[in-house]
Amino acid sequence: MVIFFESIKINKVSIETEIIDSFSEKGVQLASGKLIEADIIVTATGIKLQNFGGIRIFVDDHEVDVSKSFIYKSMMYTQIPNFINTFGYINASWTLKADLTSKYACRLINFMKDNNYAKCLPEAPEGLEETKGFLDDFSSGYVRRAASITVRQGNKKPWVNNQNYLKDIFEINYGKIEDNSLRFS
């Protein structure tokens, strides 16, 4: 294992995240056109992402197509009431976002209990535009292949998947629970 890391340190090894177009006697031809000459090739393909581990979600006997939903505060989905999903940061510790999400969930549950609400549903405003996919900041091939099945994000708060802990602290920990985007009943 030490030899591998030493080889990386002195630039004898390269790691590429790219679609393989073909193999040849010289190495690997990537879809981008780049040829990587190689003695050994280790592929890391085959992972297929699923929403919620493959669990199908139904609301009022209709299956929800998550790819048609918008994300709210990086944790709730339009079309799915009373549902919070934890999705961490790609550029920092995963648990930082998980902690914020858990705290928000507790605040939301307490707010609903205090106000005798049984249901909470994020509703995207008319004209909300999708700016990029929820996972566009990930470069891994298996993540990019799943882009068509994942939730969408909008062009303004709270419909953006922030990858910034400091922004999220204020928006999630200290922002109002009751806003123009959540519908309670």
Language-model features and meaning:
Residues 1-111, 178-185:
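Flavin (primarily FAD) cofactor-binding/catalytic cores of flavoenzymes
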Residues 71, 82-185:
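C-terminal, flexible cofactor-proximal segment of oxidoreductases
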